[in-house]
A protein has these predicted regions:
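Short, conserved beta-strand segments within well-ordered enzyme catalytic domains
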Residues: 1-3, 10-12, 57-59
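Short glycine-rich, Thr/Ser-proximal phosphate-binding strand/loop in the N-terminal lobe
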Residues: 6-34, 166-174
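N-terminal phosphate-binding loop and adjacent alpha-helix
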Residues: 23-51
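Internal amphipathic helical hairpin motif
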Residues: 36-45, 60-103
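Short glycine-rich phosphate-binding loop at a beta-alpha junction
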Residues: 50-64
Length: 174
């Protein structure tokens, strides 16, 4: 999996059968380096990242996201939703969304368009997800069907909270 963080990337390669971690690395961008340029630099220098993988995931780690109920979600209205929450989209960003099965939740977020194109050249079947989508799914897997469960995900400068009750998400926020 590849995790795009604000100042670089984290990479984890694991065996799909044993789940054993084979490779892990973090790459921090230099001050004048774009994420796309950083991606090209790291894949040029590291042959492990150019292998064929059974599955590949790009995890977007961004504070700019929001949740919307599936009952009112329309994919054609992504730009309007974004305008309501953040006023503007960056010139090199594309709005994406994850529908979280059986929850009634859609996570809307943006990705760096140039970076996504570069990564897709190496991994044409890569699956892109926002970290909040993964955390909600992870929390639901851990939650029992009855009672309330609180999951807190800590980061260097922030945290995410996912609260579930009776197997359903109640709150998911940063």
């Amino acid at each position: 999996s590849i995790r795009g963080v604000p100042n670089g990337f984290c990479f984890a390669i694991s065996d799909t059968t044993s789940k054993e971690l084979i490779y892990f690395a973090q790459y921090n961008l230099s001050a004048d380096e774009t994420k796309a340029k950083g991606w090209l630099n790291i894949t040029t220098k590291n042959a492990s990242l150019n292998n064929h993988f059974e599955e590949s995931f790009l995890l977007i780690d961004s504070e700019q996201y929001f949740l919307i109920p599936t009952s009112i979600f329309e994919a054609n209205d992504l730009s309007q939703y974004w305008q309501l929450h953040f006023n503007t989209i960056g010139e090199n960003e594309t709005i994406r969304y994850d529908i979280i099965p059986t929850t009634g939740i859609v996570v809307v977020y943006s990705v760096d368009t140039e970076l996504e194109k570069c990564i897709c050249q190496n991994f044409p079947t890569i699956q892109t997800k926002h970290r909040q989508s993964i955390q909600i799914l992870s929390s639901l897997k851990k939650a029992k069907k009855s009672g309330q469960h609180l999951n807190i995900f800590l980061y260097e400068e922030s945290f995410d909270v996912v609260l579930t009750e009776n197997g359903s998400p109640i709150l998911a926020n940063s």
